[in-house]
Design a protein with these regions (language model features):
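"Short basic amphipathic alpha-helical interaction patches in structured regions
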Residues: 59, 69-74
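Signature for the C-terminal beta-barrel architecture of outer-membrane proteins
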Residues: 50-54, 72-190
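Outer-membrane beta-barrel and related beta-rich outer-membrane complex signature
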Residues: 13-17, 68, 110, 183
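Extracytoplasmic loops and strand-loop junctions of Gram-negative outer membrane beta-barrel proteins
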Residues: 24-29, 66-69, 105-107
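Short acidic (Asp/Glu) patches
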Residues: 39, 69, 80
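A short linear-motif detector with a strong N-terminal bias
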Residues: 24, 33-34, 63-66, 75, ...
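Beta-barrel outer-membrane channel/assembly domains of diderm bacteria
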Residues: 1-61, 84-90, 94, 154-170, ...
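Short Asp/Glu-rich motifs
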Residues: 12-13, 65, 144
Length: 190
């Protein structure tokens, strides 16, 4: 069992700022998206056996470059997720990750968390030339409305060293579709 609690608050000075979606000082001051929360950051049960890791509870999930799924770790209240996850390391070069999430604990503290029905799938294959990743992130806020945001993508990244310089390279393509009460939209990223 692992647990971690966090507390962020003003020690000196005043609270002359606004925390966007939490409703704190709305419209009165500049937005600083760092509320003063005291909350459980992580609390999960974990099972590990050879290549399999299972977690159930509140956990940090950061996939690939954090572009679509990450903890937003530069904020005072990092993003965590409630749910179950499984990572299976098939071999030294292949691993697969799956998570079902029923809550996104966002950076704005508990007042702005989302109940959700999210599925995260991420698979990696490492070669001498680099790492190939395929993913599907199927996000849905659990509020009885059509609001799905589905992201499907592939990513390739690697590095190369010369005698004096290290080089990193990467390419990514993702397609995103959104289903909401106002209609369907689609976007592509590369």
């Amino acid at each position: 069992f692992t647990a971690e609690v966090e507390d962020s608050r003003i020690v000196m000075g005043q609270g002359d700022y606004t925390v966007g979606p939490t409703g704190y000082n709305v419209g009165e001051n500049s937005v600083i998206a760092d509320p003063e929360p005291t909350e459980v950051d992580k609390a999960f049960l974990q099972y590990k056996n050879e290549g399999l890791t299972l977690k159930a509870g509140r956990q940090v999930i950061a996939l690939d470059n954090h572009r679509f799924i990450g903890h937003v770790g530069w904020r005072q209240d990092r993003q965590t997720f409630d749910g179950v996850s499984a990572k299976y390391v098939v071999s030294e070069n292949v691993d697969v990750f799956y998570a079902y999430l029923n809550q996104r604990n966002r950076i704005f503290a508990e007042a702005a968390d989302f109940d959700s029905k999210d599925h995260l799938i991420n698979a990696n294959f490492k070669t001498k030339m680099g790492k190939f990743t395929a993913y599907a992130y199927l996000l849905e806020v659990d509020n009885d409305t059509a609001n799905g945001l589905d992201t499907y993508g592939i990513r390739y990244s690697g590095s190369y060293k010369t005698q004096s310089v290290g080089w990193g390279y990467g390419a990514e393509y993702a397609s995103q579709t959104s289903e909401s009460g106002s209609g369907d939209t689609a976007t592509e990223y590369d």
